[in-house]
Structures are given as C-alpha cells and as structure tokens.
Amino acid sequence: AMMVALVLPGFMWLRAGGRSSLVAIGAAPAFTFGLITILSVAYPVLDIEWEPSTALPILGMSALGGAGAWSLSFFRRSNDGFSLRGVPLREAIGVRKPIGGRQAAIRAATWGAILVGFVLAALPLVMGAAPSNPIQQWDPTFHQNGVHAMLYGKNASPFGGLHELYGGRNVYYPTGWHAFVSLFARYDSVIQASNVSSLALMAVWVVGLAALVSVLTASRSAIMAAPIIGGMLLNMPADALTMYNQWPNS
C-alpha cells in the first residue's frame, strides 16, 4: 500500500509528460512527498485533521487526474492532435504496438537488476530483526515519536506538527516522512509501519538510481549496474535505513 501511494500519483503525471516508465517510477515519490507537504501545510489552515480519510483521497484524485492527462497525451500523440478525423474512438485510441523480443529482454534485465539491488539492500533488515522490533538508536526513536504525535494531534505541518516533541513549541521540522507513515500506522503499529517504510525507501533508492543513470547515459551495463551497486552501499541504504534509520534524511 505504501508503494502504491508513493508511486501512483506522480507516475501518472510523469507518464503524461512523456517520461519512460523507469524514470516515472523513479521520480514519482518526489511528486508524492511534495503533494503531501503541501497538504500538511494547508490542512491546519483549513482546520482539516491529518488522517487517512482526508489525505489518501487527495492522492487518489491526483492519480486519477494524472491518468486522464496521460490518456489525453497518448491520444494526442497518436492522432496528430485531438481530432478523430472521422475515425471511431476505439480505433483512434488504439493499442500500443507490442515491443520486440530484444526490447523485452532489455526491460526484463533492467528490472531484474533492480530486484537484485533491492534484495541486497533489504536482506540485512529482513534477516536481522522482526518487523515489530524498534531500532535501538536515538534518531529513530525521535521519528517514531513524531509519528505518534501526528496520530494523536492530527497535525502533520512542518510548522508545528511535532510540537509535542519540543515542549509544546511550534518549531519548523521537515515532516514529509512522518506525515506519510502516519497515514499507514495505528497507535499500536508505529514501529511496524516505520520498519516497512524502510523497505519502501530502499525500493525507491534502487529504482531511482537506475532511473538517474538512464537519463545520464545510454549504456545498458551502467543502468543495470547502478541499482546493484546502490543496494550494497554502506552509507545508503545500510547506514541510513538499517543501522540508524534516519528516515527523513533518506
């Protein structure tokens, strides 16, 4: 569910802009977190509580809007404009031509490399601890308490959403991660939701690396090597998402 919410809203809009599937999936989480940040700032002003029933429908509507824009964009590119020119709608919309065997093999190899990178990144976390175990470090404890504060206070704004952690003072603190995780956590499942978010961020990391390299070079070997190497790096994801779990920085 986290990955769907992270990817789907931005993916649709990026595909409407003509980006490849890989780039759209890699960049989509930034779109989603940007939208969440805007909502988290606007909701207190509008006196709207931050909870799944108020935030997730907006993400869903964004995805639907993007899907509509993508459909119109594809229709326009396929028909040299929006005119049907006497062609039936079903025929005008058409079906994309199947990709060839070579292209299919390249895509399969690329996504296979991404899967390998994700497994390498996630293995220490999955093998080393149960999902219900809290990370025994000061930073993840702070952030998990931040999610708890949002569940109780219904305020995810970076301008005071974590006030309970600062003696009631409304200080600025980037709350994108806390706001997102609070949409999938209950009062008794903050630890589990936080740990699952680590896996989601690992997936975002390896896909994002492959997407970044794909726009920097046409080398297939470099594109496939990027997520595998990225999955084994010590600073990220090993340190940031397994050892110290500095989620907002990740």
Where are the predicted features?
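Membrane-embedded, hydrophobic transmembrane alpha-helices
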Residues: 1-106
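Core alpha-helical transmembrane segments of integral membrane proteins
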Residues: 23, 27, 110-112, 208
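Mid-membrane cores of alpha-helical transmembrane segments in multi-pass membrane proteins
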Residues: 31-35, 58-62, 112-118, 140-141, ...
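Internal/C-terminal transmembrane anchor helices
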Residues: 100-125
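Active-site lumenal/periplasmic loops and adjacent helix-entry segments of GT-C-fold
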Residues: 116-250
